């Protein structure tokens, strides 16, 4: 009926930003973003830190974790798998845990169990700017991470050529954090992605916006919306663009039980 059930406020004495939210199979709620300070009962790592907070369905906070490198870290997307493990993606200017920074802003993906204990962290990047933006899982608990890169990830070529314009990427990990493959695509101009969804057949759908021409699609204006479908092996199935003569931006996508 649309009646508000509860509202919770979370913060520090400084600036705090939330970007991603998800629920698990028990209807617990998980929120991620970043803080410029230190949350109560946590420890600051350095600079801006990513946070992950868990609430139960009544809105009672269960725990909060603050993590990152000694530099700046930004949480952007969060999802839960069938065992209520939680995955957070974003980007870092440093090196998280035992990982190595590739030269600039790197993508990270971190796994937590339902009690808030971190299981592993993976970091990937180029010498250019790389941003993790969204994360989702399939029915086998494989993890898919999307975002944008100004370089060429894992041997992929940047579609912008020598100009190194931003491309979109899709990376698959298994539940142990082992990378399975990396796919990268883009136009000769700027491309950025924000939304991801996985259907019942483990096909992946990615949305965002482009300033160029993706594949054989038409361009409509300055910035156009795109939707791309990949299969579970990382092979692109199709791409579509739409837009007006002005700027059009897409930030989220979902699928229903019939895979629409």
Residue map of PLM features:
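A sequence-level/structural motif corresponding to short, flexible coil/turn segments enriched
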Residues: 1-260
């Amino acid at each position: 009926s649309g009646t508000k059930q509860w509202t919770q406020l979370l913060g520090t004495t400084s600036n705090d930003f939330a970007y991603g939210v998800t629920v698990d199979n028990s209807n617990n709620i998980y929120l991620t973003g970043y803080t410029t300070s230190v949350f109560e009962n946590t420890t600051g790592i350095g600079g801006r830190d990513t946070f992950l907070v868990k609430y139960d369905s009544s809105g009672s906070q269960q725990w909060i974790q603050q993590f990152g490198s000694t530099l700046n870290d930004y949480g952007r997307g969060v999802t839960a798998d069938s065992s209520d493990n939680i995955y957070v993606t974003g980007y870092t200017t440093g090196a998280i845990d035992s990982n190595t920074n590739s030269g600039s802003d790197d993508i990270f993906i971190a796994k937590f169990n339902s009690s808030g204990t971190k299981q592993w962290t993976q970091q990937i990047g180029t010498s250019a700017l790389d941003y993790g933006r969204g994360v989702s899982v399939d029915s086998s608990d494989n993890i898919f991470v999307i975002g944008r890169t100004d370089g060429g990830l894992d041997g992929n070529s940047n579609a912008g050529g020598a100009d190194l314009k931003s491309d979109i990427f899709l990376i698959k990990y298994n539940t142990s954090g082992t990378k399975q493959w990396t796919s990268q695509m883009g136009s000769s101009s700027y491309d950025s992605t924000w939304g991801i969804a996985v259907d019942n057949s483990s096909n992946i759908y990615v949305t965002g916006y482009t300033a160029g021409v993706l594949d054989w699609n038409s361009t409509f204006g300055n910035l156009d919306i795109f939707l791309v479908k990949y299969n579970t092996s990382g092979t692109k199935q199709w791409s579509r663009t739409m837009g007006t003569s002005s700027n059009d931006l897409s930030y989220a996508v979902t699928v229903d039980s019939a895979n629409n």
